[in-house]
């Protein structure tokens, strides 16, 4: 996805929406945009330092220089031994103290960023109301007060889905997060910092919850269907703390244009189920993550076998990609698969160093017994005497109010509300409907990819019907 497309799709919306922003809108938006950019700048700065320190501690070339440095000073009398100890202590201190501290700082910046963004978009907005539908299951990430690695699957209606999932996650966690001052005080005193529950999103070949530079690079230059392998995912889960992981199987944000393209493609692929309120799910991230869970739990999976329906799905996805991204170069996804052969250093010193670095024991991964299926719909409530749905031809009016499904942009959601009550009333309110349904994960761990794909497809059929049902049965009470 190019920069212009990314900016229009995720940040400001269409050019028409962008032109509607006047000077007062920009004056109110600018301070908030600067705050968010400040988080991005600090995160990028500390990430650069962290990666540099990790590079000089683990890179084969740097280890070779370290060896040459030691050999040189070993021939210098008196001060040579001091120089060798000085570098060794500096590297050890950076590895054992500075890098873990920077990891905690980066973790804190990511959480404060999400807390601030949640506050800007959902928590303190009078014109934005979130409703959990009747019959929804509660999100539960803990067992015996211990956080569990939890999978959530969700439809994709807006870039604000990321913030909304963070909002639901934070509301479901009893953990108290440090303020910035408390965090700095604990760092200064050298006190142990408690592990915070983590939420990550799996997509674009990354696990993330912050707009990092490497993520933006993938968004701009690579295919959005890029996925991590099951071995890579297992390695991440065993190195990091237990975390909640959210997947958007649709990959792309649902829009009228993509819905029309999907319906046209369905005429050529009658084997593929047609959805009216969703995009057809992509399976790769889901199947590889489930394979990683199975590997962690030592559960043997059934073998895959070829079938016609699976091939039809892949052809459908390929044609959809071609239409949505006409200018995309398919070679971009191949670049990430190529690996540079490591520098081979025939020296026991280097081997010993590498063993010390990689000797960390894998962490215990506690997998939640449930998968949480989250459904999100955004509505704008408008007062009108008549209405027409250009997609389905049937738009219900609720006591003079029309419910319009929307995909709000970041600019639209972070824009502050004016203090005047008249200004608040003049704005059309946004209603967010959320449904949560849980499914047992244990039976799925033995499934092969085909069975997992079918399971996810069935969940999408249910989700499509649910959205249709919510649209018809929603009621607006007026005073």
UniProtKB/Swiss-Prot annotation:
Keyword Transmembrane carried by entry: yes
GO BP term, pick one: phospholipid biosynthetic process
UniProt protein name: Protein MUM3
Molecular functions per Gene Ontology: acyltransferase activity
Keyword Transferase among record annotations: no
Parts of the chain that traverse the membrane: 33-49
Organism of this sequence: Saccharomyces cerevisiae (strain ATCC 204508 / S288c) (Baker's yeast)
The entry's keywords: Glycoprotein, Membrane, Sporulation, Transmembrane, Transmembrane helix
Any one GO CC term of the record: endoplasmic reticulum
Lineage of origin: Eukaryota, Fungi, Dikarya, Ascomycota, Saccharomycotina
Chief location of this protein within or outside the cell: membrane
């Amino acid at each position: 996805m190019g920069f212009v497309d990314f900016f229009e799709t995720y940040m400001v919306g269409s050019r028409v929406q962008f032109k509607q922003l006047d000077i007062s809108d920009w004056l109110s938006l600018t301070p908030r945009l600067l705050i968010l950019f400040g988080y991005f700048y600090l995160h990028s700065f500390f990430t650069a330092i962290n990666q540099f320190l990790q590079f000089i501690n683990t890179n084969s070339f740097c280890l070779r220089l370290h060896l040459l440095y030691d050999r040189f000073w070993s021939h210098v009398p008196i001060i040579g031994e001091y120089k060798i100890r000085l570098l060794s202590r500096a590297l050890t201190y950076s590895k054992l103290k500075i890098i873990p501290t920077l990891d905690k700082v980066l973790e804190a910046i990511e959480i404060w960023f999400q807390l601030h963004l949640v506050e800007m978009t959902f928590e303190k907005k009078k014109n934005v109301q979130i409703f959990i539908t009747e019959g929804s299951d509660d999100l539960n990430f803990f067992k015996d007060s211990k956080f569990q690695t939890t999978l959530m699957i969700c439809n994709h209606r807006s870039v604000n889905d990321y913030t909304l999932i963070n909002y639901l996650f934070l509301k479901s966690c009893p953990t108290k997060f440090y303020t910035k001052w408390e965090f700095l005080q604990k760092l200064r005193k050298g006190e142990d910092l408690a592990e915070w529950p983590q939420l990550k999103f799996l997509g674009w070949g990354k696990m993330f919850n912050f707009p990092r530079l490497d993520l933006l690079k993938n968004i701009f230059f690579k295919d959005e269907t890029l996925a991590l392998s099951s071995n890579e995912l297992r390695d991440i889960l065993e190195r990091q703390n237990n975390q909640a992981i959210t997947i958007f199987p649709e990959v792309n944000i649902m829009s009228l244009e993509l819905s029309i393209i999907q319906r046209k493609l369905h005429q050529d692929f009658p084997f593929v189920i047609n959805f009216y309120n969703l995009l057809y799910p992509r399976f790769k991230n889901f199947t590889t993550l489930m394979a990683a869970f199975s590997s962690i739990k030592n559960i043997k999976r059934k073998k895959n076998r070829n079938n016609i329906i699976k091939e039809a799905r892949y052809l459908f996805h390929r044609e959809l990609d071609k239409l949505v991204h006409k200018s995309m170069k398919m070679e971009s996804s191949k670049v990430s698969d190529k690996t540079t052969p490591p520098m081979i250093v025939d020296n026991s010193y280097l081997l010993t160093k590498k063993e010390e670095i990689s000797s960390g024991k894998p962490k215990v991964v506690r997998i939640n017994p449930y998968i949480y299926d989250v459904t999100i719909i955004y509505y704008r409530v408008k007062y009108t005497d008549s209405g027409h749905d250009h997609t389905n031809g049937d738009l219900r009016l609720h006591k003079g109010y029309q419910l319009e499904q929307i995909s709000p942009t970041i600019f639209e959601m972070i824009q502050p509300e004016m203090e005047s009550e008249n200004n608040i009333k003049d704005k059309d309110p946004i209603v967010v409907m959320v449904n949560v349904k849980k499914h047992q994960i244990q039976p799925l761990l033995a499934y092969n990819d085909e069975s997992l794909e079918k399971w996810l497809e069935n969940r999408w059929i249910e989700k499509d019907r649910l959205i249709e049902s919510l649209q018809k049965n929603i009621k607006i009470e007026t005073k």
